[in-house]
Amino acid sequence: MEVLPPLDWEKVGAETWGDVGGQIKQMGIGKVAKGLLLSSIQERTKTWDGIFRPVRQPEWWQGDGEYHGPKYTEPVSELERRLKLGEFVVACEIAPPLSASTNKLNSNIDLVKPYVTAINFTDNASATPRMASWACSKIAIERGAEPVMQIAARDRTRAGLQGEILGAAALGVRNVLCVTGDSPVLAPQPRGRMDINDLDAIQMLWILRRMRDEGRYLDGREVKFPPKFFLGAAASPFASTPKFQALREHKKVNAGAQFFQTNLVYDIERMEIWLNELAKRDILNKVYILVGITPLKNLKMARYMTDVPGVYIPESILKRMEAAEVAGNSQEEGVQIALELARKIKGYEKQGVHGLHIMPVGWEDIVPRIVTEAGLS
């Protein structure tokens, strides 16, 4: 279970290679060179391990490759309750406001609440500051909605994570989605430092599962009143080859993930390949999967999405959007594509899919129509 592996982002960032460089200096550049160039295979392997293992496997990390199911039996949230009952659930995402005003946030919550089981609030998506996910989650609870609080490792230390989760639990938050977080390279200038990454999503899941199920802080102290929450993680079927992505998802399940919300899916056949890879690892019966979709507003948005890491849009969909753009009805075509995808995704209930996660990207008004016309209400 490595720290900041290449599969988290498009490529390894400077923060990882900086640690590697520091480890080489600590071992001695001459000793490393000799170990890699002049020694036997065994010595070369030992040298490589000496460089990378301290970076990838910090001393405090005690995770393993085994599955650790939740220690509780009764659902802790409405989302978990419905999933356990076998319902095909619908969740949606609302972007937190860029200011302290909650007017638009309140109206969006009220708009989608009758149509979805849970509402996900992102945590500084694209490394851009917004209202905190825990604050949006508390507002949702006050308005009678079920929140999914997203928490990004990018902005957390080990101490900060544990303190924040206790506060969220005290506010009534029961669904937590752990993500590594978008790279700070996406942030507006002046950006924060790129070399501070204390945790990744897998380690977050492991820490939070232990707090909940074992009643222990990372340092071993007892949590007298452990927090209760349904632990989730992000999954990205197209971020790399399905075989390697399934390995990443497997690690998250072993660490504590009980449900996945996937990145955008526009190619159902490739999604099926990913599901088959998960099945080979025998984890489909250990995690609930909510597949993500976003309605395309226009051709420009479709083309932009093709450059987003982890998103794949088939040529057939791009051609449909191009034709619709010429005809002047690209927005409606985008809705029809989303409806087709939603119906097809629901058809995978017996193959490991348990729900739909709609990411409207500021187009919350379209959520009721998608849910209703796709037959999901």
Give the predicted meaning of each segment:
Residues 89-103, 147-159, 229-244, 323-336:
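Active-site mouth loops of central-metabolism enzymes
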Residues 43, 47, 101-102, 127-138, ...:
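Active-site-adjacent beta->alpha loops and helix N-cap segments on the catalytic face
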Residues 93, 119, 168, 252, ...:
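Conserved, mostly hydrophobic/aromatic
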Residues 153-171:
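Glycine-rich anion/phosphate-binding loops
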Residues 23, 99-111, 133, 159-165, ...:
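Short, acidic/polar
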Residues 1-20, 45-52, 67-78, 181, ...:
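Active-site pocket-lining/capping segments in soluble small-molecule metabolic enzymes
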